[in-house]
Structures are given as C-alpha cells and as structure tokens.
C-alpha cells in the first residue's frame, strides 16, 4: 500500500506503513471465524477423511469443546486488558507520523470473540446433526491430495 501511494501520489508517510499491519491484523483476526464456518481451517485429513460422518462429528465436537473454545476464551481474556491499557493510555507508535495502536489491538479480542461464537455455532450444528434435526454437507471438503 505504501509503495502504491508513494508512486501514485508522490507521498510517503509512516502511517501508510503501519496501516498495512492494521489491515493484516483485521484480515487474519476477523477472517478466522469465516474460515472456521466454511471448514477451511488447517488440519490433517489423512485419518479424518476416511472416517464415517458420525465419527467426524464426534472428533469435531471433541476438538471444539476441548481445544477451540477454551483456547479462544483464554486468549480473549488475555488480550482484552492489553487492548484496554492501550486505549486508556492513548498509546501511539514510536515512529514519526505513526498511528494510535489500540485499533490494531482491538482486533485480537474481537477476533477471538468471533471465533468463539462461530465455534458455538459449529457445536450446535453438530449436536443438531446427531439429533437428526439438521443436515450437514460432508462433501464440501477437498479430497485428499
């Protein structure tokens, strides 16, 4: 982005450099819940891909309940005070022309919250599938390569 602005408008600023990592933080942290929703997160499908639908549901439930939810809640718990500290102190970048830091830090607890909410949604969908009140599509995953 900085190179684009510099060459197009003959203008450069440290804020253009810093906005890049703000945008990266937003893309990663706010996009994580969407990645979970469409089941494109990283995992090893060597065994999972050969299991029955019911076994996949149980593995997903275990992973969501034992790992994803506790981790996201704990990370949000850790990130929230960091955000508040930056917000109340008005922490700024040490670079000349730099930006305030709290908007980028807000992406952490917001992203963890969104992944937690999506994790709860995934748990509800899997429990509904086990109760035969919701139909899940197990064919959207990419085949093993």
What residue spans do the PLM features occupy?
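Alpha-helical transmembrane segments and membrane-interface helix-loop junctions
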Residues: 1-145
């Amino acid at each position: 982005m900085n190179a684009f602005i510099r060459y197009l408008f003959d203008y450069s600023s440290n804020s253009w450099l810093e906005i890049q990592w703000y945008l990266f933080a937003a893309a990663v942290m706010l996009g994580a819940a969407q990645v979970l929703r469409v089941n494109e997160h990283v995992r090893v499908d060597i065994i999972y891909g050969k299991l029955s639908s019911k076994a996949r549901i149980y593995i997903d439930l275990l992973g969501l309940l034992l790992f994803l939810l506790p981790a996201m809640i704990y990370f949000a718990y850790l990130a929230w005070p960091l955000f508040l500290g930056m917000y109340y102190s008005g922490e700024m970048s040490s670079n000349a022309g730099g930006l305030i830091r709290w908007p980028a830090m807000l992406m952490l607890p917001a992203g963890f919250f969104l992944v937690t909410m999506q994790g709860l949604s995934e748990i509800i969908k899997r429990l509904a599938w086990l109760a035969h009140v919701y139909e899940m599509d197990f064919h959207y995953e990419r085949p093993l390569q």
